[in-house]
UniProtKB/Swiss-Prot annotation:
Annotated region described as Disordered, given as residue ranges: 1-58
Listed Gly residues bias regions: 21-31
Provenance organism: Alcanivorax borkumensis (strain ATCC 700651 / DSM 11573 / NCIMB 13689 / SK2)
GO MF term set: rRNA binding; structural constituent of ribosome
Basic and acidic residues bias spans: 1-18
Gene assigned in the entry: rplO
GO biological process entries: translation
Subunit structure as annotated in this protein's UniProt entry: Part of the 50S ribosomal subunit.
Pfam families in UniProt: Ribosomal_L27A (PF00828)
InterPro entries: Ribosomal_uL15, Ribosomal_uL15/eL18, Ribosomal_uL15/eL18_sf, Ribosomal_uL15_bac-type, Ribosomal_uL15_CS
Protein name: Large ribosomal subunit protein uL15
Keywords annotated in UniProt: Ribonucleoprotein, Ribosomal protein, RNA-binding, rRNA-binding
Assigned protein family: Belongs to the universal ribosomal protein uL15 family.
Gene3D superfamilies in UniProt: 3.100.10.10
SUPFAM superfamilies membership: Ribosomal proteins L15p and L18e (SSF52080)
Amino acid sequence: MRLNDLHPAEGSRPEGKRVGRGIGSGLGKTGGRGHKGQKSRSGGSVKPGFEGGQMPLQRRVPKFGFTSKLAMGTAEVRLAELAKVEGDVIDLASLKAANIVRRDMKRAKIVLQGEIDRAVTVRGVALTKGAREAVEKAGGKVEE
């Protein structure tokens, strides 16, 4: 057996449609497109969502919600990431210095994900209830 001998099993792959090759083929003349109309023309198709001139669903339904500007400037920091910070005081500047928080972030919030194994002082950074308990359990303290 060689690569040039390989071929699919007989009847497993359908023959391609040969359109416009006489009435005997069943796809002659109009080529399976019917008579006239937009969809019979070349390049003729209605765009997705078009409902024939009726106001489309996506424009009938009201817009809702918004993106909070506060959330866009707040970074989420996992508890386990605090191990990368050198020193025992954790504030926004030290988080930025350790490349945990992007430089353009104005606020940070520490969430309970992972563990902390050393005592740290958290200053000027928000914490979730669980993260606050974990920091205090490890012997650290939180200063607002």
